[in-house]
């Protein structure tokens, strides 16, 4: 792998190696630019995926050196429901390894639907929210969705329905098997007149681009994939970036600041180098791409204060860190007479799409969501979560645990969350992280509309499980998110610098050679997992950035 000296001014520094950072690294390095990817995590099993460990203890309680996710002891954070509360220590985590969250995520990879880019125009706004149209349309992004799906490797159904975004090209791989959960949900759908399809996933169902197809081992969500079937940045993108000879991945590099000169241009990044006793190092760069995720990205911008940017970098609008969206839950669990064997295969096999569209009049709330059925939990997860309707310990607990462990199915739903300005990521004035910097503080309470949506999906989950033949059903309580893996909206894109942080090509309004490329740029949250849209937007940004750099619009 190419190695650059910190004193050597590279064309691009990319902060983060996940869904967006991996795309940016591959595209920019392939175009001939010099690239350094700053990753605060370790290598993981990069290049040696067969060494990923399936041990539940290691994956649930990872050792510092082997971790795949961030550790709240080091990447400390706090949480509160509103600005009047005192924040307490939080448990927010994210992917912290080469490949970021794509190494361990469940890999659902649906596109946004066309109307999700112009909801304000199509459906109107709502009091107390920041609902607005995106500065880009689905038609502009569609070619990049296709590019992402084919280069990364996506499995999914090739069917046409208004409930799925129109595609110029089918998915490259056939769908993953439906499993017992899929068969049961199809049974319910036939009774309830619902549309069910196989899930769209960044897990290849068959050999693709030199990688093995999924072997249905069951050590899926939360684990690294030993056969490279999960299309993470670590296997589908970064090896190609490194192979160009233009890209260095620099691990254990904790970026603390994006530096700027007197004219307001980014000049590089200052980071703590674990390999050098955590000494501060400055890496020079002509352009900085920030792809750290929807919570660490705004935190780093706020940490990068200077006399020119006293409110934080790229924050003349005052919106950095605001409009945080994470995705709410709310579902139900059902017990079935026969064993389900859901421990096999990918975590999600089937999806209910009927409630994706917006239908305020019929449902009483703004937004929608996609419903999935899952039974995959490891023995340790079952033991810690506990059986439903049973004592919390003793013989009754053990009996219920044995009875339910392989016969329980849970509806897990991804529901739209409206952008609210007071839902924020900022700097905690009291807590410091392991490097002595202000810790991340998350403040979030869902809009009252979202609580209505959560209750709607809880009720629908109960209906579906009963129709599927569940002998017992337990409804979840409303789960108002405390932050999570799908953070977005905290550096929103737009045409007006007064009401957005970056433009339609992810260039910061205030800093001409700073690009924010991850879920932070989302304007509205969407009804599906955000990763495929993050990837498509990154391909679009890279395309623009390469053309701009070669034409002199970005000085490289």
Where are each of the predicted segments found?
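A conserved FAD-binding loop/helix module that cradles the flavin
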Residues: 524-542
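FAD cofactor-binding and catalytic pocket of flavoenzymes
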Residues: 78-101, 105, 110-111, 116, ...
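Residue-level detector of alpha-helix initiation sites
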Residues: 18-19, 295, 521
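Conserved N-terminal glycine-rich FAD pyrophosphate-binding loop of Rossmann-like flavoproteins
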Residues: 42-66, 95-108
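Beta1/beta-strand and adjacent pyrophosphate-binding region of the FAD-binding site
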Residues: 4-20
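A glycine-rich dinucleotide-binding beta-alpha-beta segment and adjacent secondary-structure elements
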Residues: 77, 198-205, 213-220, 256-260, ...
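Conserved redox-cofactor binding core of oxidoreductases
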Residues: 61-71, 76, 81, 85-88, ...
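Glycine-rich loop(s) and the adjacent beta-strand/alpha-helix scaffold that form part
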Residues: 27-30, 34-55, 244, 253, ...
């Amino acid at each position: 792998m190419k190695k650059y000296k910190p004193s050597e001014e590279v064309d691009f520094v990319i902060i983060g190696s996940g869904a967006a950072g991996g795309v940016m690294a591959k595209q920019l390095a392939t175009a001939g630019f010099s690239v350094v990817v700053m990753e605060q995590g370790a290598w993981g099993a990069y290049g040696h995926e067969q060494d990923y460990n399936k041990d539940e203890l290691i994956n649930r309680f990872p050792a510092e050196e082997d971790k795949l996710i961030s550790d709240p002891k080091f990447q400390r954070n706090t949480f509160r429901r509103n600005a009047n509360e005192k924040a307490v220590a939080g448990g927010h985590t994210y992917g912290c390894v080469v490949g970021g969250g794509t190494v361990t995520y469940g890999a659902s990879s649906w596109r946004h639907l066309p109307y999700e880019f112009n909801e304000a125009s199509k459906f109107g706004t709502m009091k107390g929210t920041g609902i607005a149209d995106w500065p880009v349309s689905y038609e502009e992004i569609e070619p990049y969705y296709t590019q992402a799906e084919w280069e990364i490797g996506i499995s999914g159904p090739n069917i046409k329905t208004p409930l799925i975004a129109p595609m110029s090209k089918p998915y490259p791989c056939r769908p993953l098997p439906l499993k017992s959960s899929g068969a049961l949900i199809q049974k319910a759908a036939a009774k309830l007149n619902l549309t069910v399809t196989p899930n769209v996933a960044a897990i290849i169902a068959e050999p693709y681009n030199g990688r093995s197809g999924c072997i249905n081992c069951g050590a899926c969500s939360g684990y690294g994939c030993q056969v490279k079937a999960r299309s993470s940045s670590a296997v589908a993108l970064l090896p190609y970036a490194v192979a160009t000879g233009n890209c260095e991945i620099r691990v254990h590099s904790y970026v603390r600041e994006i530096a700027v000169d007197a004219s307001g241009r980014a000049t590089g990044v200052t980071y703590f180098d674990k390999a050098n006793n955590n000494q501060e190092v400055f890496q020079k760069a002509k352009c900085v791409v920030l792809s750290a995720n929807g919570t660490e990205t705004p935190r780093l911008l706020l940490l990068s204060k200077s006399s020119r940017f006293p409110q934080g970098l790229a924050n003349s609008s005052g919106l950095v860190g605001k409009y945080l969206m994470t995705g709410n839950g709310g579902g139900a669990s059902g017990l079935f007479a026969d064993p389900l064997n859901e421990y096999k295969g990918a975590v999600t096999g089937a999806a209910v799409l009927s409630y994706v569209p917006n239908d305020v009049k019929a449902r009483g709330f703004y937004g929608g969501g996609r419903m999935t059925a899952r039974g995959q939990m490891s023995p340790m997860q079952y033991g810690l979560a506990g059986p439903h309707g049973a004592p919390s310990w003793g013989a009754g607990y053990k009996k219920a645990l044995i009875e339910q462990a392989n016969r329980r199915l849970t509806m897990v739903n991804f529901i739209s969350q409206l952008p609210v300005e007071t839902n924020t990521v900022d700097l905690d004035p009291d807590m410091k992280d392991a490097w002595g910097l202000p810790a991340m503080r998350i403040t979030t309470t869902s809009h009252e509309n979202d609580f209505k949506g959560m209750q709607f999906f809880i009720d629908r989950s109960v209906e579906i499980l009963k129709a599927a033949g569940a002998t017992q059903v337990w409804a979840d309580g409303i789960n108002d998110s405390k932050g999570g893996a799908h953070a977005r909206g905290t550096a929103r894109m737009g045409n007006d610098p007064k009401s957005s942080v970056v433009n339609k090509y992810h260039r910061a309004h205030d800093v001409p050679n700073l690009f924010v490329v991850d879920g932070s740029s989302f304007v509205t949250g969407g009804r599906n997992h955000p990763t495929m849209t993050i990837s498509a937007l990154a391909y679009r940004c890279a395309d623009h950035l390469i053309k701009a750099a070669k034409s002199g619009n970005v000085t490289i």
